[in-house]
């Protein structure tokens, strides 16, 4: 019997469209002999939909019409089953789901919001858990964690919107102390949205204004000199991680834009469309160092499934800086696994999710006590 896999994608996110592309790539390449595909699309206003019309990329040209053709659903638990309940009257169960596969990108979805709900109802799911997802979405928390554990990160500062409003001159001085040029980022977004390189104080002010459109938490980093951008994917869980080939991302620009990452090769290719050299033109020593850092970073976060870790290399000093980890990478980084088919990669991710669920099911999730039986009024409330 085929396992029913509910692919969750879309959502209230600046990376909504990229999530759609990544999910459709996965649904088109998953092993159809092992798995039954159930699309679960989250609209831009946060409603969940399912239906066969969601499987065709051309239907996403008109999202309003697509949602009308599809069934509005809610993910629920009924008994021991996880179901898609039709929201509109008459209510009915449209499908059961054996395992969920979130392929979501960005704030509000990839940050643990989706897997947090799945955890709440006890549902099995592929990819990393709530904790890794939350840390993976916040570039500042990542840097603090990695630096504390001996992994190099580029010099940086961070602040919140109110900090800048109340202490602009102090923050601008901290930025200047990093030395220009710097890169200004929303701390909890991805896909290069809201990111700007600033070469002077006026640039910094404009860059902060742009980044604040997307997030109240801002990260400013020193631009690495003699820069070469490198990416490495990691597959597995805490028991066994494996690093992919390392790619060198090429661009004539100072920084890869959203368009560079996703649209250069056509609107259906996702991250696979970016200009890249695989394997990267780097020494064996640098390759080994990046692989070792990647496995260490994944162990620290206890990632599961597939992730991508982005690096900055100073080609003059050979210093390697971990830039950020992507908990659910665009296109699931399938293009970095030349020795594994897209189909087998997806099977591996799903099987890791099943293993994670089985391991967690063995742990006690409740504690027997008679507190409620003896509870009388509010006297027993913890103060």
Tell me what each language-model feature is.
Residues 159, 195-200, 234-237, 314, ...:
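Short beta-strand-to-turn element immediately C-terminal to the catalytic PLP-Schiff-base lysine
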Residues 199-270, 281, 285, 320:
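Phosphate-binding site of ATP-dependent enzymes
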Residues 285, 315-383:
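C-terminal active-site "lid" helix and adjoining low-complexity regulatory extension at the edge
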Residues 210-217, 262-314:
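A long amphipathic alpha-helix within ATP-dependent nucleotide-binding catalytic cores
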């Amino acid at each position: 019997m085929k396992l029913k896999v509910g692919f969750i994608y879309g959502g209230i996110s600046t990376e909504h469209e990229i999530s759609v592309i990544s999910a459709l790539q996965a649904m088109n390449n998953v092993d159809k002999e092992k798995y039954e595909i159930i699309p679960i699309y989250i609209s831009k206003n946060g409603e969940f939909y399912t239906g066969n019309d969601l499987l065709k990329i051309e239907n996403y040209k008109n999202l309003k019409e697509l949602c009308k053709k599809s069934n509005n659903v809610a993910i629920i638990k009924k008994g021991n089953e996880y179901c898609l309940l039709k929201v509109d009257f008459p209510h009915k169960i449209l499908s059961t789901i054996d395992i969920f596969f979130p392929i979501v990108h960005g704030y509000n979805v990839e940050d643990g919001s989706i897997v947090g709900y799945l955890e709440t109802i006890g549902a099995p799911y592929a990819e990393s858990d709530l904790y890794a997802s939350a840390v993976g979405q916040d570039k500042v928390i990542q840097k603090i964690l990695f630096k504390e554990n001996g992994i190099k990160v580029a010099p940086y500062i961070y602040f919140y919107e109110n900090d800048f409003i109340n202490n602009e001159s102090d923050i601008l001085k901290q930025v200047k102390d990093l030395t220009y040029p710097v890169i200004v980022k929303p701390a909890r977004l991805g896909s290069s949205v809201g990111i700007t390189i600033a070469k002077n104080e006026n640039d910094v002010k404009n860059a902060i204004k742009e980044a604040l459109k997307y997030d109240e938490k801002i990260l400013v980093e020193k631009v690495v000199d003699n820069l070469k951008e490198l990416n490495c994917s990691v597959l597995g869980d805490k028991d066994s991680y494996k690093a992919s080939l390392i790619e060198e991302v090429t661009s004539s620009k100072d920084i890869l834009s959203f368009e560079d990452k996703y649209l250069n090769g056509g609107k259906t290719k996702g991250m696979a469309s970016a200009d890249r050299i695989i394997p990267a033109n780097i020494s064996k020593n640098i390759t080994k160092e990046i692989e070792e850092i990647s496995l260490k970073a994944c162990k620290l976060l206890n990632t599961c499934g597939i992730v991508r870790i982005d690096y900055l290399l100073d080609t003059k000093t050979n210093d390697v800086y971990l830039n950020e980890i992507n908990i659910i990478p665009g296109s699931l980084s399938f293009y970095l696994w030349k020795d594994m088919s897209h189909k087998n990669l997806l099977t591996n991710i799903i099987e890791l999710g099943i293993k994670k669920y089985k391991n967690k099911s063995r742990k006690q999730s409740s504690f027997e006590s008679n507190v409620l039986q003896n509870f009388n009024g509010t006297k027993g409330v913890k103060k």
